[in-house]
C-alpha cells in the first residue's frame, strides 16, 4: 500500500467527486485530508462514508464577505472533525469567519534546509560583488504585493536614500504569463530594469536564498509563508506585512521589520537593512534561532499525531 495518486486539475467538481469516491473505495481510505480543492464534496463524503475521518489544513485566511458565503462555508466545513491552521492568524480568521473554534488548532508547517548546488550563483546571474541582494518569492503580483514592492524601490531610488547598490530578485511568476507581462511593465514604467530581476519559476530556491542578504514578503494576505521560513533558515532578516501568520515568525526589531499592507513608504524602510550590514547580520542570527522552531521533522511528527488522534 502507499504511493501517490494524481488527479487532473482541469476537471469539474462532479468529476473530482467521482475521482475521490473511487480512490476511497479502491484504497480503503480511513482519513481524507483536505488541503485545497472543492470543500463542497465534504458533506457528501460524510453521507456516503460515515466512518471515514475528514480533516483539513487551512493554509490561508478566510474573508467572509456576506451571509450567503458564510452559510455556504459552514455547510461545507460541518463534516470536518479537525481544522489544522498553519498559523494563529489563520485560526483567528477561521473562527471569526465561520466558527468551529473547538475543532480548530494551530500546527505550524516546517521546512528543511537543502544542500547548495551552485555556490557561484551570483556570478551566474551577473550580480556584481558588494551589491545587496533582496529576494521575494510568490506566484501572484497582487496577492504577494509585488506592485507595492516596485513602488517602494522606486521611492528609494528617487530619493537617493540607499548607501549601497541593490538588486531585487523576484521568484515564482511564471514566464509568458499575464502576471509576468504585468510585472515587466511595472518594472519598465518605474525605470527599474537594472534593479529588479524577475527570474520566473526556479528549482534552485536554496541557492538563491544563499546569495541573498534580505528577504521581502509584501503580501496583501498570507497564511504562513514557507518562503519566509526558508529565508530564516539561511539567516536572512525579513521585512513583511503585518498580515496572517507573518508576525508570528517575523518579530519586529528582532529578526526584521513589519509594515502595514499597501504602505509603500513603510516598506521603503528597506533602507535600514540595506544601509546597515551589522543590523542585517544581527537580525539574521536571530532569524536562524527562530527557524529552529519550525523544522520539517517536527511538523511531520505532529501531523502523524493528529492522524492517530482522529483514527
Question: Positions of the model-derived regions?
Answer:
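A short, active-site helix/loop in glycosyltransferases that binds the activated sugar's phosphate group
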Residues: 80-106, 111
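Short hydrophobic beta-strand element within catalytic cores of glycosyltransferases
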Residues: 237-240, 250
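Aromatic "clamp/platform" in nucleotide-sugar-dependent glycosyltransferases that forms part
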Residues: 201, 220
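Conserved acidic donor-binding segment of nucleotide-sugar-dependent glycosyltransferases
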Residues: 252-253, 257-264, 272-278
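Glycosyltransferase donor-sugar binding loop
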Residues: 137, 167-181
Amino acid at each position: 500500500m502507499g504511493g501517490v495518486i494524481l488527479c487532473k486539475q482541469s476537471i469539474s467538481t462532479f468529476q473530482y467527486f467521482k475521482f475521490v469516491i473511487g480512490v476511497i473505495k479502491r484504497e480503503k481510505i480511513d482519513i481524507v485530508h483536505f488541503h485545497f480543492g472543492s470543500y463542497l464534496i465534504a458533506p457528501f463524503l460524510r453521507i456516503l462514508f460515515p466512518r471515514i475521518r475528514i480533516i483539513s489544513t487551512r493554509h490561508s485566511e478566510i474573508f467572509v464577505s456576506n451571509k450567503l458565503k458564510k452559510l455556504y462555508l459552514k455547510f461545507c466545513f460541518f463534516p470536518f472533525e479537525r481544522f489544522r491552521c498553519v498559523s494563529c492568524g489563520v485560526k483567528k480568521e477561521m473562527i471569526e469567519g465561520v466558527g468551529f473554534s473547538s475543532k480548530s488548532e494551530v500546527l505550524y508547517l516546517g521546512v528543511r534546509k537543502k544542500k547548495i548546488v551552485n555556490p557561484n550563483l551570483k556570478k551566474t546571474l551577473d550580480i556584481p560583488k558588494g551589491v545587496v541582494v533582496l529576494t521575494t518569492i510568490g506566484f501572484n503580483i497582487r496577492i504577494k504585493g509585488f506592485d507595492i514592492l516596485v513602488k517602494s524601490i522606486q521611492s528609494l531610488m528617487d530619493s537617493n536614500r540607499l548607501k549601497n547598490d541593490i538588486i531585487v530578485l523576484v521568484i515564482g511568476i511564471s514566464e509568458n504569463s499575464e502576471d509576468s507581462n504585468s510585472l515587466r511593465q511595472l518594472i519598465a514604467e518605474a525605470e527599474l530594469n537594472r534593479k529588479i530581476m524577475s527570474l520566473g519559476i526556479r528549482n534552485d530556491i536554496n541557492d538563491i536564498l544563499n546569495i541573498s542578504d534580505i528577504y521581502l514578503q509584501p503580501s496583501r494576505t498570507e497564511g504562513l509563508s514557507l518562503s519566509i521560513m526558508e529565508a530564516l533558515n539561511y539567516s536572512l532578516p525579513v521585512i513583511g506585512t503585518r498580515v496572517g501568520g507573518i508576525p508570528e515568525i517575523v518579530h519586529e526589531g528582532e529578526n526584521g521589520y513589519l509594515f502595514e499592507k499597501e504602505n509603500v513608504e513603510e516598506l521603503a524602510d528597506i533602507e535600514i537593512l540595506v544601509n546597515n550590514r551589522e543590523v542585517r547580520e544581527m537580525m539574521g542570527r536571530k532569524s536562524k534561532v527562530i527557524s529552529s522552531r519550525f523544522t520539517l521533522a517536527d511538523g511531520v511528527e505532529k501531523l502523524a499525531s493528529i492522524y492517530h488522534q482522529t483514527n
